[in-house]
Amino acid sequence: MKLFDLQILKSLPYRGRFRGGYMFKGGIFKFIFRIIKLLLIIFFVGSILLVLLYRFVNPPITFLMIERGFERKAAGKDWKIDKQWMDFDDISDPMKRAAVAAEDQTFLENHGFDFSAIEKAIKKNEHSKKLIGGSTITQQTAKNVFLWPGRSFVRKGFEAWFTLLIDIFWSKKRTMEVYLNVIETGDGIYGVEAASQAYFHKSASKLNNYQAASLAVIFPSPLKWSVVRPTRFLRHRRYLIMRNMRRLGPLEF
């Protein structure tokens, strides 16, 4: 380009320069920004509608159930999703108390988050290679129903959002009902009714304190821990859960 041409170019207003260059790039950035903005709006509205839907409609399946099904197929096993929905009022009171005693003793008082537990988890994460959670029952329900399996800070962010929505739009009764019906309780087994039938050959409506605590004890790791063959560690954990159940007394939902 000649020096004369460069002088003419410099004299042009900024908006008139490189219509296929700078302005085109600016248009691309605006287009990308609009797409991101649209996706955020869709996620925001869609997530609210989905949480509202599941306030009245029972979740038919979860990402974890699907993943576990494929894992079984890859291992040469049959596809298995054993789940039997049970309404809140039909689940035995000991089972509800065992869940609270084992997983979230402030469940009826907190608003989806237990900040003291989160603070402890953050301190542990500073010295751990794995992400350690301080999850409430509401957070676990958000994770189990709406999110994919795994642990990452991104997923924790989504979990926090869905936890907030559940706390806003669901009652504690509905949260506990969904939690006890979708939680993994064994290899291909989900929910306390299917687990009760598999391990105790009885309905979850008839579980006593000991059986409910035996079931709640495996909630953190249902594929590694056994209800029927508990280790010494699990037996001690079951004792602690039963002690907490007595301390909690009847729960007022």
Regions found by a protein language model. Give the residues of each.
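Juxtamembrane regions of bacterial inner-membrane/periplasmic proteins
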Residues: 3, 8, 24-253
